[in-house]
Amino acid sequence: MKNKLKKFFKYFTFLFLLSLIILYGYNNIELYVNKISISSNGNNVNTDILKTQIKEKIKLQNFFNVNPVNIQKELINHPWIKKIEVYKKFPDKLILKITERVAIAIFNDVSLVDESGNIFKKLKKKKNLLKFYADDQKEVKYIYDFYKKFIKFQNLNNIQIDISYIKINSIKEFEVRTKANNLIYFGSKNIDERLGRFIQLYRSIELENLNNVEYFDMRYTNGVSVKKRR
């Protein structure tokens, strides 16, 4: 029994010392990151600037001491980065794979809204995007959910209605303006039913007649009010 314990202790000591030697060697080998590869599904992240920032951050670090998790945590704060993977490839390469946010709308003419309904960046350049309007940015989620339903109903009925803006007021009533300059009042109740009713009505009206419609008021229980342009 004692011999077995001695053998085990010797074996354990050997492995421990070997590990220390390997770690010491890794930390003292002059091996650094010389290549940084960045791929992205969009073009809103400036990869050249990103490479410069990363090089500055890790320039004095041994390849084995570079921590991909720390780089990932730092870069995820970039407004356009939705997801990022960072990993090393021996002997001297750092690889980054970026998934960018997709801007689908502009909130109150000042901020961008992404494909998940999140406000993520101040608008700097004019963009031809759908507009969301509300008194409070907390209402963006309600507008986004309404927008997704509107698109779903269009897809189910094989129809396309180009939207200029969606607005919600303080009592959560929805108002939509199309790019054909039709205004639609949906109110705040029975949204699914009213959307379905509107889609059926819209597809039954010929294009030239749509151009003569000022607004559709869907806030009726069984019908709709249509006002023509003068």
Predicted regions and their residues:
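Flexible glycine-/small-residue-rich
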Residues: 40-42, 98-102, 134-136, 178-180, ...
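Extracytoplasmic segments of membrane-associated envelope/inner-membrane machinery
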Residues: 94-170, 176-177, 183
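Extracytoplasmic/luminal low-complexity segments enriched in Pro/Gly and acidic/polar residues
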Residues: 189-230
